[in-house]
Curated annotation (Swiss-Prot):
The modification N-acetylmethionine is found at residue 1. Signal peptide: none annotated. It comes from Mus musculus. This is Very-long-chain (3R)-3-hydroxyacyl-CoA dehydratase 3. Belongs to the very long-chain fatty acids dehydratase HACD family. The chain crosses the membrane at residues 150-170, 190-210, 213-233, 243-263, 281-301, 323-343. It catalyses: a very-long-chain (3R)-3-hydroxyacyl-CoA = a very-long-chain (2E)-enoyl-CoA + H2O; (3R)-hydroxyhexadecanoyl-CoA = (2E)-hexadecenoyl-CoA + H2O. It is a multi-pass membrane protein. The modification Phosphoserine is found at residue 114.
Amino acid sequence: METQVLTPHVYWAQRHRELYLRVELSDVQNPAISITDNVLHFKAQGHGAKGDNVYEFHLEFLDLVKPEPAYRLTQRQVNITVQKKGSHWWERLTKQEKRPLFLAPDFDRWLDESDAEMELRAKEEERLNKLRLEREGSPETLTNLKKGYLFMYNLVQLLGFSWIFVNLTVRFFILGKESFYDTFHNVADMMYFCQMLALVETLNAAIGVTSTPVLPALIQFLGRNFILFLVFGTMEEMQNKAVVFFVFYSWSAIEIFRYPFYMLSCIDMDWKVLTWLRYTMWIPLYPLGCLSEAVAVIQSIPVFNESGRFSFTLPYPVKMKVRFSFFLQVYLVMLFLGLYINFRHLYKQRRRRYGQKKKKLH
């Protein structure tokens, strides 16, 4: 005996570019919905007029449609959307003139052609308005947002490093050399904040928000945080040494010239004195900072050897103990290599800025 094919109730509506079909099946499982040779094929397990069964139907469309139907399942029905290949109104849904018994208009969504024309015109106007706004307003808006973001970032960093610089300077004039030994406990929190925030600077260079080369920014970020978090931050014996003062002072002295220069660049201002300081003060300050960091690393080697912190033993068959001081010695080599890379980068910047004036003098 031939199995009876069960068809669900299907309601349809249209717009100029789309067809909508609502299949009256609840609790649908395993739906198979596809379009081949301009025919919509539907088959699914669900609860319909004949109870919980497998329902299916096939509809050959009146005109050409795109072969990728979209559908959405709800608890009570299946909503199918089909894109027309041409934007025009159909007089009926199917190629056969006689409407299938299971098919009916969806009066909840139905529009006549004049209503649909008005809706289409409204959507087109909305799209054109959106494109015009994007074309006219978007580039300027994005540029302003970028400038505002960079200005605020540089301002926050300037305030942070200025606080450190002023704090260290005032305490030195009041306490003299005694101020060297508790530098870490007085300004470490602010230095942690500024150096963690410096990650943003590296990311800006990496994603193209700024034109800064990634390598110099990354070298400075990793180098400083190695000193701050590992050498100083993990060993209390290092936090009371005078070298902390010189490291923090050189870092903050460099940044109080660099960040205000970047701030003014965001608003297209050029203060000649500040520009000269930004392109000149690094010449003595970067080597002093590098020397201070090297002294800090050298002083920390016996401290790490004595404590054994971060040391580890290689697994069998090597079974060799690797001290953290080995990595500190490697870092010393990398420190001066990084200094060379940054020095070279800054020298090129200075030559681009002032090189032409020197040529004109000869």
